[in-house]
Curated annotation (Swiss-Prot):
One GO term of the biological process aspect: translation
Gene Ontology annotations for the cellular component aspect, listed alphabetically: cytoplasm; ribonucleoprotein complex; ribosome
Any one Gene Ontology molecular-function term assigned to this protein's record: structural constituent of ribosome
Swiss-Prot/TrEMBL keywords: Ribonucleoprotein, Ribosomal protein
SUPFAM superfamilies with a match to the protein in the record: Ribosomal protein L36 (SSF57840)
A Pfam family that the UniProt record links to this protein: Ribosomal_L36
Protein name as catalogued: Large ribosomal subunit protein bL36
Cell wall biogenesis/degradation recorded as keyword: no
Source organism of this protein record: Leptospira borgpetersenii serovar Hardjo-bovis (strain JB197)
Family statement drawn from the similarity comment of this UniProt entry: Belongs to the bacterial ribosomal protein bL36 family.
Amino acid sequence: MKVRTSVKKICSSCKVIRRKGVIRVICTNPKHKQRQA
C-alpha cells in the first residue's frame, strides 16, 4: 500500500474508488494499491 498525496491509475486494471471519504486505488496487481494521505 502506497500512501501519497496524489493517487493515479498506474495500469488499465486500476480502479479509483472512494471508501469512507478516503480515495483509494484498487488493482489486481498488489503493488498498485494506493491510498490518499
